[in-house]
Curated annotation (Swiss-Prot):
Annotated site, Transition state stabilizer, chain positions: N162
Residue numbers annotated as active site: E260 (proton acceptor), C294 (nucleophile)
Upper taxonomic lineage: Eukaryota, Viridiplantae, Streptophyta, Embryophyta, Tracheophyta
Name the UniProt record assigns to this protein: Aminoaldehyde dehydrogenase 1, peroxisomal
Residues that hold Na(+) according to the record: N27, I28, D99, L189
GO cellular component, one term: peroxisome
Cystine pairings recorded for this chain: none
Length: 503
């Protein structure tokens, strides 16, 4: 049965609105290269309307509608949204799959996480009520001080195409739990499920303007949103190059930003491991989500004594991965998201080969798939640390391999990068794992696994992988400002100045 993609408009102030310039962008299914629909293309004029709607939502009834309402009221809406998503899970999963090429089983698992994320932040919204007016211990008993946590205000949420609904939720759920009003700008390459969230918000009666969804091109809708003077904070997930531009724009207005950017994460494999078990984790860490993960452990650093045998096993695992239309049962690798990204991935592989690297397996379109932006899982050896394939993010199913002889050498290879998002260490020596968890320069360290993420645990990087943390309590704090309230409690005058003479 054909999957129907609804023709949505922009979601602004609780209503569907045609873009002022009436522009639209075609949706291309990366598995078939066929147009499956289109999305509205917002411009500055539409962004202005969305920001105005968010401002009104914050201030309506002196905030009692949303920003100053109880956390328990906001939690009810978040749970209602979660319930609707759960109800529509199968439909949303298929839409996600044909929109961005994600294997259906992955898309459905993402939606389970979406539901759990809204429910988790509903709980934190309720807890926020009891944490208000937390007292501060002071050295002077003539003063009493406490803390208020208040929503930052209007927030711009700019999200990527590799986890369209899930990464939007990582931002939306905590922002709304905090009492902010948001404008979501998803990637133009994968906006379909994010637009469906607008319909869900209508169905649950979310107050107007609390969540606005503007789709469109980055240089039009995204840039207008990032530079808008009435946006109080920007949260961005995407490339380091775009993140740098957003940071520069925000600096002109001294505006806070949270950035989750690119990565070139290492996976360090020591000689004492179970080779088959670690081979699967290594393949999963790099090729999951079609290799399009910002935290992909795409630099394998393996002990020289096991390198030949281990890489041979990796090749067998990689060549056994089912590559197919993502809607097919058992698909474990779908297409790259777009033609431009597909060409970029192939160019990176070609560049590595021209620089002297060896393509052990993959590096091309699978023979059985004549259409779609498919790339076989690719393993590259004979790599030097100066090669582009070792230093720059590919965002495709490509693993580069180097060997090491000592623990110190492994650490130096792992940390020799501008990025610092994820990292993994594989060893049965837990003391060694502990040493590396401290030595690796990354926001996340996985021990004897790769890529697990949990709503309760912080997610984010260091160096050029950005700053700020999403998920867990840290995700909520992203959207809260801290206000100190201090009261003088003594009946005595302050007594700093000599009082004026009484005539």
């Amino acid at each position: 049965m054909a999957i129907t993609v609804s023709s949505r408009q922009l979601f602004i102030d609780g209503e569907w609105r045609v873009p002022i310039l009436n522009k639209r962008i075609p949706n291309i299914n990366p598995s078939t290269e066929n147009i499956i629909g289109d999305i509205p293309a917002a411009t500055k004029e539409d962004v202005d309307l969305a920001v105005d709607a968010a401002k009104r939502a914050i201030s309506r009834k002196n905030g009692r509608d949303w920003s100053a309402a109880s956390g328990s009221l906001r939690a009810r809406y978040l749970r209602a949204i979660a319930a609707k998503i759960k109800e529509k899970k199968d439909e949303l999963g298929k839409l996600e799959s044909i929109d961005c090429g994600k294997p259906l089983e992955e898309a459905l698992a993402d939606l389970d996480d979406v539901v759990a994320c809204f429910e988790y932040y509903a709980g934190l919204a309720e807890e926020l009520d009891s944490k208000q007016k937390a007292p501060i211990s002071l050295p002077m008993d003539t003063f009493k001080s406490y803390i208020l946590k208040e929503p930052i205000g209007v927030v711009a949420l700019i999200t990527p195409w590799n986890y369209p609904f899930l990464m939007a939720t990582w931002k939306i759920a905590p922002a709304l739990a905090a009492g902010c009003a948001a404008i979501l700008k998803p990637s133009e390459l994968a906006s379909v499920t994010c637009l469906e969230l607008g319909e869900i918000c209508k169905e649950v009666g979310l107050p107007r303007g609390v969540l606005n969804i503007v789709t469109g091109l980055g240089h039009e809708a995204g840039a207008s949103l990032a530079s808008h003077p009435d946006v109080d904070k920007i949260s961005f997930t995407g490339s380091s190059a775009t993140g740098s531009k957003i940071m520069t724009t925000a600096a002109q207005l001294v505006k806070p930003v949270s950035l989750e950017l690119g990565g070139k994460s290492p996976i360090v494999v020591f000689e004492d491991v179970d080779l088959d078990k670690v081979a699967e984790w290594t393949v999963f860490g790099c090729f999951f989500t079609n290799g399009q993960i910002c935290s992909a452990t795409s630099r394998l650093i393996v002990h020289e004594s096991i390198a030949v045998e281990f890489v041979d096993k990796l090749v067998k695992w990689a060549e056994n991965i089912k590559i197919s239309d993502p809607l097919e049962e058992g698909c474990r690798l779908g297409p790259i998201v777009s033609e431009a990204q597909y060409k970029k991935v192939l160019n990176c592989i070609s560049s590595a080969k021209s620089e002297g690297a060896t393509i052990l397996t993959g590096g091309r379109r699978p023979e059985h798939l004549k259409k779609g932006y498919f790339v076989e899982p690719t393993i590259i050896t004979d790599v030097t640390t100066s090669m582009q394939i070792w230093r720059e993010e590919v965002f495709g199913p490509v693993l580069a391999v180097k060997t090491f002889s000592t623990e110190e050498e492994a650490i130096n290879l792992a940390n020799d990068t501008h990025y610092g998002l994820g990292s993994a260490v594989m060893s049965n020596d837990l003391e060694r794992c502990e040493r590396l968890s401290k030595a690796l320069q990354a926001g996340i360290v996985w021990i004897n696994c790769a890529q697990p993420s949990f709503i309760q645990a912080p997610w984010g990087g260091i160096k050029r992988s950005g700053f700020g943390r999403e998920l867990g309590e840290w995700g909520l704090e992203n959207y809260l400002s801290v206000k100190q309230v201090t009261r003088y409690t003594s009946d005595e005058p302050w007594g700093w100045y000599q009082p004026p003479s009484k005539l």
